[in-house]
């Protein structure tokens, strides 16, 4: 009789790990504290709830995360399967209806013959094979347990979610439908700003009241999900090179490029809700309302969910984990998700996929599974276990810079990325034969 594996946390990573194990005949206890105990950021009791954006980012193979998604798709990832089924229009990105996405994953796992769902808070790491995938909002008690077994102090930063608004309340005469550089379908509503409008908006952001942070917590942001008011503090031009970048978004009414653009992205399958792209924030709700109403087209907008901000937690992985996401000092324990230093929905799920496949192979006596570095999955696993500057280890998105250089140098960036993507998928196909 095979051993039962404990997977703690039913987020993206834990859900993927549990699924990979169960599909290989391994019995799994999937332990999730919600709804018994909620977090400051979650709104439901569903598995793999998306708490920041509803976008899983770029889908093209000229994009690092696009390659990662395709690798996972070929490895029967439950997260990518759900995303493909719950997809909503988003240009060249893969965005999903949050409810359909998490609902599909929840039902699939709850009905799997090899998975037992246990709703309770875990304060101590259980004996036996365990995958810890408790995510950025790990409870203080369990976080201390993790510190005790890793021997390292926690690292932490803040992650922020953007406001969501009702489409019906948008002044459609002031916005236009377009994707940047007309890539993919025209999927974004764009709110153009003149220089005067931008300056009024920018000044209001700087004066807006920020929600308080506990004095004992040092703020440490990851660039990929930084509050827009923090970006604004870096200088008047920072937003213009970030979420309000107008390049490739010429107004079809005038044929001219606006001074600044705020983009709205569809958030649900019905197309009734939109999120404000890149506007994750920690402003007080009243301040959010005042600032958002300065955006052309959103003067009378109805905000259905205000932006929120919450603490994230991750470990110094290069010192304590190997490429199989195993704890070097206690290989029966694995970590998965953002806690390992992978950053992003897809990256988190990919780490769960690696942990789950590896543990299944170990239990079934099939030997270890180390993905080739030429694959995006392998390069992420290599990064978290071999990062050179581990004294200042930082979370990392999937990107082509993590992959080994090509044997023949290609100057053109797009052609180089295409070559790296093709190589990654070739390596993956060969590697799959060993699984």
Curated annotation (Swiss-Prot):
Alphabetized, the UniProt keywords read: Cytoplasm, FAD, Flavoprotein, Methyltransferase, NAD, NADP, Transferase, tRNA processing
Tell where it localizes.
Cytoplasm
Q: Which InterPro entries does the annotation name?
A: FAD/NAD-bd_sf (IPR036188), MnmG-rel (IPR002218), MnmG-rel_CS (IPR020595), MnmG_N (IPR040131), TrmFO (IPR004417)
* Entry keyword annotation includes Amino-acid biosynthesis: no
Catalyses which reaction?
A: uridine(54) in tRNA + (6R)-5,10-methylene-5,6,7,8-tetrahydrofolate + NADH + H(+) = 5-methyluridine(54) in tRNA + (6S)-5,6,7,8-tetrahydrofolate + NAD(+); uridine(54) in tRNA + (6R)-5,10-methylene-5,6,7,8-tetrahydrofolate + NADPH + H(+) = 5-methyluridine(54) in tRNA + (6S)-5,6,7,8-tetrahydrofolate + NADP(+)
Question: Pfam families recorded for this chain?
Answer: GIDA
Q: EC no.?
A: 2.1.1.74
Q: Which cofactor does it need?
A: FAD
Annotated GO biological processes are: tRNA methylation; tRNA wobble uridine modification
Q: Which GO terms describe its molecular function?
A: flavin adenine dinucleotide binding; tRNA (uracil(54)-C5)-methyltransferase activity, 5,10-methylenetetrahydrofolate-dependent
Give the stretches traversing the membrane.
Answer: none
Task of the protein: Catalyzes the folate-dependent formation of 5-methyl-uridine at position 54 (M-5-U54) in all tRNAs.
Similarity section? Belongs to the MnmG family. TrmFO subfamily.
Q: What is this protein called?
A: Methylenetetrahydrofolate--tRNA-(uracil-5-)-methyltransferase TrmFO
| Gene name per UniProt | trmFO
């Amino acid at each position: 009789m095979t051993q039962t594996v404990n997977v703690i946390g039913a987020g993206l990573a834990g859900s993927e790990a549990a699924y990979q194990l169960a599909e290989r005949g391994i019995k799994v206890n999937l332990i999730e504290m919600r709804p018994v105990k909620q977090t400051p950021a979650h709104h439901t009791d569903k598995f793999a709830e998306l708490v920041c954006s509803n976008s899983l980012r770029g889908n093209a193979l000229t994009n690092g995360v696009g390659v990662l998604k395709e690798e996972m798709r070929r490895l029967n990832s439950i997260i990518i399967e759900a995303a493909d089924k719950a997809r909503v229009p988003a240009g060249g990105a893969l965005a999903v209806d949050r409810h359909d996405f998490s609902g599909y994953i929840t039902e699939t796992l709850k009905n799997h013959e090899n998975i037992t769902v246990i709703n309770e808070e875990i304060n101590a790491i259980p004996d036996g094979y365990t995958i810890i995938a408790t995510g950025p909002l790990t409870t203080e008690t369990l976080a201390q347990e993790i510190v005790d077994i890793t021997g390292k102090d926690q690292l932490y930063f803040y992650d922020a979610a953007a406001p969501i608004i009702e489409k019906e309340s948008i002044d459609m005469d002031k916005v236009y439908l377009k994707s940047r550089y007309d890539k993919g379908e025209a999927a974004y509503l764009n709110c153009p700003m003149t220089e005067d409008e931008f300056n009024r908006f920018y000044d209001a952001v700087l004066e807006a009241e920020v929600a308080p942070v506990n004095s004992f917590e040092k703020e440490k942001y990851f660039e990929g999900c930084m509050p827009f008011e923090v970006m604004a503090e870096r200088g008047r031009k920072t937003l213009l090179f970030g979420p309000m970048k107008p390049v490739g978004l010429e107004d079809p009414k005038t044929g001219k490029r606006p001074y600044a653009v705020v983009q709205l992205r569809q958030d649900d399958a019905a197309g009734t809700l939109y999120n404000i792209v890149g506007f994750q924030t920690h402003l007080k709700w009243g301040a959010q309302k005042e600032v958002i109403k300065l955006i052309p087209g959103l003067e009378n907008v109805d905000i259905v969910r205000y932006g929120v901000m919450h603490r994230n937690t991750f470990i110094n992985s290069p010192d304590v984990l190997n490429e199989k996401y195993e704890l070097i000092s206690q290989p029966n324990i694995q970590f998965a998700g953002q806690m390992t230093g992978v950053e992003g929905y897809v990256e988190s799920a990919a780490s769960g996929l690696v942990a789950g496949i590896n543990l299944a192979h170990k239990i079934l006596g099939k030997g270890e599974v180390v993905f080739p570095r030429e694959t995006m999955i392998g390069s992420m696993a290599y990064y978290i276990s071999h990062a050179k500057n581990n004294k200042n280890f930082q979370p990392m998105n999937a990107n082509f810079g993590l992959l080994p250089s090509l044997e023949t140098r290609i100057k053109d960036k797009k052609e180089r990325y295409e070559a790296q993507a093709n190589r990654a998928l070739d390596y993956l196909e060969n590697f799959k034969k060993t699984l």
